């Protein structure tokens, strides 16, 4: 979490990230978290 201080602010986005993380397609919807997750994958 320390890596993205910006995301830490919006707690509502936190739970949303977990959902897209599993589906993969959802990550693209997030855009912010989707881009990093794609690179890791």
Curated annotation (Swiss-Prot):
Keywords: Chromosome, DNA-binding, Nucleosome core, Nucleus, Phosphoprotein, Ubl conjugation. The modification Phosphoserine is found at residues 14, 19. Residues 9-41 have a biased composition (Basic residues). The keyword Plastid does not apply. It is found in: Nucleus; Chromosome. The keyword Nucleus applies. A motif (SPKK motif 2) lies at residues 9-12. A motif (SPKK motif 3) lies at residues 14-17. A motif (SPKK motif 1) lies at residues 4-7. Residues 1-41 are annotated as: Disordered. A motif (SPKK motif 4) lies at residues 19-22. GO terms for molecular function: DNA binding. GO terms for cellular component: nucleosome; nucleus. Monoubiquitination gives a specific tag for epigenetic transcriptional activation and is also prerequisite for histone H3 'Lys-4' and 'Lys-79' methylation. Phosphorylated on SPKK motifs 3 and 4; which may regulate DNA binding. Dephosphorylated during maturation of spermatids to mature sperm and rephosphorylated at fertilization. It comes from the Eukaryota. Belongs to the histone H2B family. Core component of nucleosome. Nucleosomes wrap and compact DNA into chromatin, limiting DNA accessibility to the cellular machineries which require DNA as a template. Histones thereby play a central role in transcription regulation, DNA repair, DNA replication and chromosomal stability. DNA accessibility is regulated via a complex set of post-translational modifications of histones, also called histone code, and nucleosome remodeling. The nucleosome is a histone octamer containing two molecules each of H2A, H2B, H3 and H4 assembled in one H3-H4 heterotetramer and two H2A-H2B heterodimers. The octamer wraps approximately 147 bp of DNA. Contains 4 SPKK motifs which may interact with the minor groove of A/T-rich DNA sites. Phosphorylation of this motif may regulate DNA binding. This motif is reiterated in both termini of histone H1 and in the C-terminus of plant H2A, but its presence in the N-terminus seems to be unique to sea urchin histones H2B. This is Histone H2B.3, sperm.
């Amino acid at each position: 979490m320390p890596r993205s201080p910006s995301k830490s602010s919006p707690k509502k986005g936190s739970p949303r990230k977990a959902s897209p993380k599993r589906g993969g397609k959802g990550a693209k919807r997030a855009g912010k978290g989707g881009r990093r997750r794609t690179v890791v994958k």
